[in-house]
Amino acid sequence: GKIINKTVYLCVGLKQNGLKEVLGMWVGKSESSSFWMGVLTDLKARGVQDILITCTDNLNGFTDTIRTVFPQSSTQICVVHQIRNSCKYVVYKDKKEFTADMKNIYNAPNKEVAAAELNNLERKWGGKYPYAILSWRNNWDDLTVFFQFPLEIRK
């Protein structure tokens, strides 16, 4: 036999009652906007009428694809991916402290407090890691969409 690595992409929906439901699984060679266009049109063809909010890894073109198929959907960049991306710019000895400081941003109770925490992060680390901070600034609107929703949806 031969072992072949395959990637399976999973779409999970969160119902209004808080229950999660697997909407589908797709095997793909790579994440591309055309791949996701196929996934989203498949979901729509199978009856998905509305998506309140999506959470993506900020793949180039993915957000535009979502907005094409489900124009009313809000799109949130995945905070875990943002943290990983930010940490690429931080040396190992600072990562633990830097990550703890970032946690204050995404655990904030609202967008205003989150913005203040980002300012604190920039004051403390901006001189040493400007690109890590710039990544947050450049993506701020798409990183803070979830603050428009109740805590139950954010978790």
Which sequence ranges carry the predicted segments?
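RNase H-like nuclease fold core
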Residues: 1-55, 60, 64-72, 139-142
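Flexible, active-site-adjacent loop/turn segments at secondary-structure boundaries
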Residues: 2, 12, 21, 25, ...
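Structural beta-strand/beta-sheet cores of well-ordered domains, especially the beta-sheet scaffolds
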Residues: 7, 52, 76, 132-134, ...
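Hydrophobic alpha-helical scaffolding
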Residues: 26-29, 52, 56, 88, ...
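Conserved beta-strand -> loop -> alpha-helix junction used to position metal-binding or nucleic-acid-contacting
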Residues: 53-60, 65-103
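Acidic/histidine-rich catalytic cores and adjacent linkers
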Residues: 108-155
